[in-house]
Amino acid sequence: MKHFDIHSVNRSLETAIQAKIDNLNKPKGALGRLEEIAMQVSLIQESLTPSLAHPCHLLFGGDHGIEREGVSVSPREVTWQQMINFTHGGGGVNMFCRQHGFKLRIVDVGVDYDLSDVEGIIDRKIARGTKNFRYEAAMSEQEFDQAIHVGCEMADDCIAEGCGVLCVGEMGIANTSPSSIWMSLFGNIPLADCIGAGAGLDKPGIQHKYEVLSKALDNYRSQEPQPTPITPLRYFGGFEMIAAIGAMLRAAEQHLVVLIDGFIMTACAVAAIRLYPTAKDYMIFTHCGDESGHKRMLDMMGAKPLLHLGLRLGEGTGALCTYPLIDSAVRMINEMNNFDNARITKYF
């Protein structure tokens, strides 16, 4: 796997940043989480005047072999249908990107459909979906490396345009299944506590999903008695998920603000942090969604989401919805007057 050189944020400016925030014309701490966000963005950028230049959103698409086991209520073809819909501007992700000024890149990493001639989709297809991890590894080590490379390449394209804040999303029917398994493995949490309804499974559907994933885990443990850190990632992950991990790590390496979306992207963030713990410094965990286990996964990392809106769409939509709060935090530290300039008595 590619090596990333990700340093912890430089905290030498922390005292100066805090002093600037505390001297804004407001009671100390009165803007709550906005002050915390302003501190984090300032530390990431090593600046007393942070900015959110050229926000970009990467949406990676891929299909999953495990879908063949009936673990999702949505049929496989919804992945490619939605990918095409995104090119027409008709998805939830399109609306929020337009609303908040994000440049959207739609990337086919492993959709089980030929999208090579579809205008608006970047073709980086590694294979037409992963293998079925109920019986074997979802991808080879070479395919894993390719997916990481795709994520890095797409992040680099954004960076070349001056991007300072990167949001990452996904489209892939059945990708809650590998996310649930990663949560169980990485958090040492019973699998049953990690499985939810996904796109809308009923109780019998959830039970079937549990049985399939439980057998897949048993098979994995027998096939991989001495796993490396990347073994569970390539064994269960989707191409779109591994590409997302690559993009997150590359963005952290280059000191970008990285917005983490819902259950699937949080699972990818957990995976990225397991490989490079310092990557967490660059991540803002934007919301806690409605998918079973999302809150617990956030708690595993000590992450404090900004919003609780009951979202479970994916695509990066929750992270995009949160962006105005992050923008407000940056505007606060840059545009709000301080006590001296406003000629207001500092009363603390």
Question: In which residue ranges do the predicted regions lie?
Answer:
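N-terminal loops that bind phosphate or other acidic moieties
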Residues: M1-F348
